[in-house]
Amino acid sequence: MSKAVVVFSGGQDSTTCLIQALNQYDEVHAVTFDYGQRHSEEIATAAKLAKDLKVDSHKILDVTVLNELAISALTRDAIPVSNELMDNGLPNTFVPGRNILFLTLAGIYAYQLGAESVITGVCETDFSGYPDCRDSFIKAMQSALEQGMDRELKLVTPLMWLNKAQTWALADKYHSLELVRDQTLTCYNGIVGSGCGTCPACLLRAKGLNDYLDDKAGVMAELDAKC
């Protein structure tokens, strides 16, 4: 029996990964991390989606210690989300160590469950300047987890080389475009669905959707060539 753990935030990318996993694995477990993020709606959205999609289990882990250590627009209400990069070249929504922590804990959970895969929706094509969304980082994390736990564990990144239009096409391939469009939360301002329309996450999401809707056949062909 094939088993997977999906790192699940309730956003567009992780929901698309979860839907794909439900079609590819016999048993799928979702794990959501409460790190004191800007909007608690993210946790509620993930819980509702996990229930509606009938995952085998959904675990919400309290990792609010990350909030104490990582200063970011996503962990501090007093820091407004900016469309400009900081002096270090990173967006101010970058939470240092977040994916290191999430993948480590998801890997431990996978070990407990006997799951062979941890699935995450990180993407280098549209990685928004986050260093912990790069393929090189994922490969390094997989190596560290396998060595540290002395067992094979695959970090699966279905979206790594997809642009946002192709990610929308992937949701549509599983007949879930409307669900992802209307019920996920990607917005940095905590608005489900189309979001605020002005934050970086909403702008990237909307552009990808428009690009897909403008050329469905072409984008789907690009997706099929990559998958």
From Swiss-Prot:
Its EC number is 6.3.4.20. HAMAP family: QueC. The keyword Cell division does not apply. Belongs to the QueC family. Zn(2+) binds at C187, C196, C199, C202. Gene3D superfamilies: HUPs (3.40.50.620). Catalyzes the ATP-dependent conversion of 7-carboxy-7-deazaguanine (CDG) to 7-cyano-7-deazaguanine (preQ(0)). Disulfide bonds: none annotated. ATP binds at F8, S9, G10, G11, Q12, D13, S14, T15, T16, C17, L18. Pathway: Purine metabolism; 7-cyano-7-deazaguanine biosynthesis. Pfam families: QueC. Its cofactor is Zn(2+). GO terms for molecular function: ATP binding; ligase activity, forming carbon-nitrogen bonds; zinc ion binding. SUPFAM superfamilies: Adenine nucleotide alpha hydrolases-like (SSF52402). This is 7-cyano-7-deazaguanine synthase. Keywords: ATP-binding, Ligase, Metal-binding, Nucleotide-binding, Queuosine biosynthesis, Zinc. CDD domains: QueC-like.
